[in-house]
Structures are given as structure tokens and as C-alpha cells.
Amino acid sequence: MAPTKYFHSVQLQQDKCQGCVSCVKLCPTEAIRVRNGKAEILGDRCIDCGACASGCPYHAFTVKTDTLEGLSKYAYNIVLPAPSLYAQFPANIPLEDIWQGLQNLGFDEIFDVSLASEYIACEIEKYLQEYTGGRKPLISSTCPAVLRLIQVKFPELIKQIMPVLAPVEAAAIYVKKEAAERRHLPKELIGVWFISPCPSKQTNIRQSVDVKQTELSGSFNLSEIYGLLLKNLGGEKKLHVRTGSSYGLAWGAYGGEIASAGIQEALSVHGIKNVYEILEQISMNKMPQLDYVECHACKGGCLGGILAAENKFVAESNLRKRIHNLHATEPDSRKETMAQTMVLEDFPKSEQYRKKLVPRPMMQLDDDIMEAMKKFERMEEVLCDLPGLDCGACGAPSCQGLAEDIVQGKAHEIDCIFKLRAQVHKLSQGMLELARQIPIYHEPKFLNNTEDDNQ
């Protein structure tokens, strides 16, 4: 059963909000309203995709992440850099310098997430080979914002989600167990940290939708870590970190999952609006020819996350150069290339740690079913009387959203400017008619005489 209270890393600073409704129109789940000149987030609908934050001209939205002070809570700290971090730097900066910079910031150990990506890619490939009889395409499970979007708007597609862990979750499970055994430490004293390019991954650490128990201790804002790394890159000691191949590195950009799993009939889509449109098509069973759809809420994939420091096009160029340079040193065969790096023992299998997604109840008009039906009928009546322009001037994202708010007692019909104008016109016509019925006033004669006497 879905929780009734949700944690959100995307938060609104109302003092900065100007009530411009830009965020209202951008939100894919209609989770924002503007009331009394300020935006409000509806927590049961928000999926922490960050679309509101990326489109707010007043920077009224912020993302709550962890700080490096949190390292002091643990005896041993492991950081999980992903390709999205490497992409912030030009390809001529060695990964060893970035890893050394992370150690200079206080981390004891580094584990490259791209290596975990290859294990997950193999799980995806195997599952597709054995998948028979069910609806296609299957939908990638690596983006938490997409999973939440499906929970809220497309619950019928939950059964088509690929049942594998996100690489960072699998990496966290592996490194904490392995480090605890190697360092002879209880797991509670080991901190495992992610450097996140987006808010949805931070939210998933605090309240996961697909992992029974995350082993991640928290995550840091990628742009903040990037700024610190610029001052701490490299050093005399060069760290050796076991890393993945070019196929694991490719997961940072859109299309990387498909390439690493060797899927032919597949589609890669990025940007929450585009993802929404594709999910609508899948929901109507219009893409049965596809085996797999790779979805990223952020434009450009994880490289376009709102917490990234570098422009997403520059970051993509940086990453693809790294991929090209690494691929030039590898065998031609994808499977042979990945076999050279996948040498870890007892890497976790997704089925042991993943939990089943459940729909998230979004629009519940009332706890009492009879009362809910009455409200629904009333909502339909109100909606029929609204203009249907979905202009957003009322503070709701659509006329249907306003109708729902009205029956819930959270808005009024005259919040619609067209209804307000009609009401004002009706009142003015009434006042005009009333004015016509009032007798014409004549000044008493003695007033005029008084004025003449004064002269």
C-alpha cells in the first residue's frame, strides 16, 4: 500500500514566488496551484521531477540534499560517482584526478556506478529474452521520477515496468556489504553516498518506490560537489578504482541502457513532457512492436538534471568523447567487452531487493463512496460550465483541475476570469437596469433661490 505522507526534496520558497503560474503549466501531474498569489505544492501528486524548478523565472524552488558534514556520522564513507559527474569535466581530465578529488573531500573509498550499470544491463537483456506472453514494450525502471509518474498518472502500466534495480541502488547494496566484511565494520558505521544530478534520486533515498531497503545514506547536489572538486582535483597519490566499460559509461546519456543491453527494438525518450506522451501511447497499446522503452524525466537524460553544473549539451559532448576514447581500447564484441569488467563476486540480483510498485491514489474526492460520486457529478457539471481553455489564469493547471478544486471547497467559480467577467457583466447590467428605474432627482426650488440671493 502506498504511503499517505510523502517526502519531497523539491521545496518551494514562497517569499520568492511571484504567482506567475509558470510552474503550474509545467507540472506533468498537476501538482501545483497558485492561491492568494503564491504557488502551493500538492504533496500527494508531486513526483519530484524538478520541472517546476527548471522553469521558474524567479528561482522560487529549491532542492533539499545532504551536506558533507554528514560524513562525520560514519566511520567509513564510500562515494558512488556516476557518469553524470564525469560529464561535467572535459574528456582530457583523467578519471583518476576526479577520484582523487573526491578522496580529498573526505571520502574513504570510491565505487564507479558505471560498473553496476553493466550488471543491470545484463539483467535487462536476460529478462527480455525470457519474457513471453505479456504486453510490450517494457519500461525502464532507472528513473525514479518516471516511476512516480506511472504511479500517479498511468497505474495500468506498472506491470510493464522492468523489474530491475537502478544501478546506484545495486552498487550501494554491493559496496556496503563488501566493505563491512573487508573492513570488519558493522554496516551501520558505513556511509554510502551518491552525487545526484536530480531531485528524484534524492527523494528515492528517503522514500523509495522500488527498493525494499536502500543502502544509500544520502546524496549530494552535483553542482555543489563539482564546485568543490574544481579546487581539489588530482594529487600526488593516484587512486585505482575498478570501473566499467564504455557501455556502462554510456548510461549517463540517453540511449545508454539500450546500447549496453543490446536491445534492437527499443526507443529512448527524455524530457518529462515527451515521456508523458510516450506513456500515453503505450497505455493505448500503440507501440507493441517495441521490446523496451528507456525513459528519462530530464532532457538529455541524467546529464540534463537540474542539479548538474554544466550545460547538458556540453556535458553530453564531454561524456561521448570519454566513451569514444574508452571504446577504442576495447574489443569489438559488446559481451566480450563487458565480461572483462564484470568480475565482481556476489553482485546483488534485483529480485532479492526490489519491491513491487503500487499505484498512488491521486484524486480522491471523498472517503465516502456515495459522497465521492455526488462530488464527481457536481464536478462534471462545473466543468461543462467552464470555458475549457486551460489557460491557467485561475491558478489551476486546467479547467478540470479548477472544477475539482471547486467541489473540494478549495476554489470558487469566479476564480475563472471568464466566469468572473461574465458575472461582472451581469452585475453591471443589473445595476444599469436598476438605475433606469430610479426616479430622476430634481433640486428643490428653494435651493436655487438661496443661490440667487447670495449673488
What residue spans do the PLM features occupy?
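Short gly/ser/thr-rich secondary-structure transition/capping motifs
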Residues: 7-8, 122
